[in-house]
Amino acid sequence: MDSVAFEDVSVSFSQEEWALLAPSQKKLYRDVMQETFKNLASIGEKWEDPNVEDQHKNQGRNLRSHTGERLCEGKEGSQCAENFSPNLSVTKKTAGVKPYECTICGKAFMRLSSLTRHMRSHTGYELFEKPYKCKECEKAFSYLKSFQRHERSHTGEKPYKCKQCGKTFIYHQPFQRHERTHIGEKPYECKQCGKALSCSSSLRVHERIHTGEKPYECKQCGKAFSCSSSIRVHERTHTGEKPYACKECGKAFISHTSVLTHMITHNGDRPYKCKECGKAFIFPSFLRVHERIHTGEKPYKCKQCGKAFRCSTSIQIHERIHTGEKPYKCKECGKSFSARPAFRVHVRVHTGEKPYKCKECGKAFSRISYFRIHERTHTGEKPYECKKCGKTFNYPLDLKIHKRNHTGEKPYECKECAKTFISLENFRRHMITHTGDGPYKCRDCGKVFIFPSALRTHERTHTGEKPYECKQCGKAFSCSSYIRIHKRTHTGEKPYECKECGKAFIYPTSFQGHMRMHTGEKPYKCKECGKAFSLHSSFQRHTRIHNYEKPLECKQCGKAFSVSTSLKKHMRMHNR
């Protein structure tokens, strides 16, 4: 049986605190203390029925808070001091008994002090006032110690310092939790999944993942949360409060996590590194989730369909597929989203915000994924490698499409002519030949395009803009893909090799045209005479015969020709 000290079942006041109590509050205190003595007597201890009121009649008596000292000590060893001896103890009959019950809500407590603190949560039923008021923010406290701890949030004082890493803390409890991260101590284990946690409060919050309990409900929208900190952050979406500001650019955020994530764009600091692949993270929790990619662990399982997830937030978002819940609604267009990241990215469509800026060229992006992919154009990094031929790519989609060259898969088929394609982009481009229609139209010449990027590149043929310059020879290009291909003329790289004859090519179009010599394929057919060609350039030259088009003119005599070979032959006449 556990032994408890008298302080465990008592509540006390300093002389100053007692003076602040109203007569009705003093009466309540006496009633509660007398009830305590009755409880003690009922479990076998002999207690004299004290006159509680007499404790406070003598001004010289010293009532002390819970410091291990006597609750009430008379100057000359009065009867009061005898009755309140700190060495007295009682024995619990049954472990886990909670004898102190709140008369307002029925909640029970092990200690009377816990009950008295709880009673203050009920409006109009405070045991006593909160005499300690903060001058900075006007927050009031019942206890001097609580007030002193709060003051540190304004002064910045952090008296608890970790000997391992030097990190400092305002409060003792977070300091204790932090120390466990060094020794790896996690004494609180979940009975459902076996996950171990460093503190009891974290275990309680974690257990709600299994039970589905969400005790914290937003009064504005009714949304419920499993954790008190989550509802505090959520409430700011209604109030518009953003208390965490970036010191670099002044941008404000609703949560501390958000501002730390944002800070990466300035300093790139990621202290938590994966031992498997070297990837770094801002928070240890992010690293733990990432490590599950390597271990294959997926501890969060959907009760509806059985699908498992590495991260608790992922399962929460997934569950909305079953419920149909889309809590994030755009105020501009009314579109709703099930996940906050998708909603935030969408909002930038309206605001035009592009928070991710490239330090090399100044180009800005609305998504961090787009920004990271763009960075590879400067670093030359191509992390996605084909296991068949060793070719590397910037993007995973490019690798996926490339693999179809090896497998022969062409999943996109034209319903008009039954022609098939390895990529959706090629298929859409082909469809324009049938429909003559595309969503992006050039204002100068009326040419249509499927993608806005293709239109932008095309517009440069009108403006003459060539933003991509070769560092080797200074030649400039209107498109990034053109400069990549051009660089091969300097390096000698010829990545496109014919398996039939071994001939290699710099340009993919040259390689494709060459392959048709072996296959005999001639996809470009003249509508006028029915003649077919393996190369598009040959087809274009041929159509000039029917159109009587002669775009190539001799500078010497002005004679015009439809093809370059005829012009070259003619030029030899002048050079004789």
From Swiss-Prot:
GO terms for biological process: regulation of transcription by RNA polymerase II. Belongs to the krueppel C2H2-type zinc-finger protein family. It is found in: Nucleus. Keywords: DNA-binding, Metal-binding, Nucleus, Repeat, Transcription, Transcription regulation, Zinc, Zinc-finger. Its main location: nucleus. This is Zinc finger protein 791. It comes from Homo sapiens (Human). PANTHER family: ZINC FINGER PROTEIN, ZINC FINGER PROTEIN 564. A zinc finger (C2H2-type) spans 100-122, 132-154, 160-182, 188-210, 216-238, 244-266, 272-294, 300-322, 328-350, 356-378, 384-406, 412-434, 440-462, 468-490, 496-518, 524-546, 552-574. GO terms for molecular function: DNA-binding transcription factor activity, RNA polymerase II-specific; RNA polymerase II transcription regulatory region sequence-specific DNA binding; zinc ion binding. May be involved in transcriptional regulation. GO terms for cellular component: nucleus. Residues 4-90 form the KRAB domain.
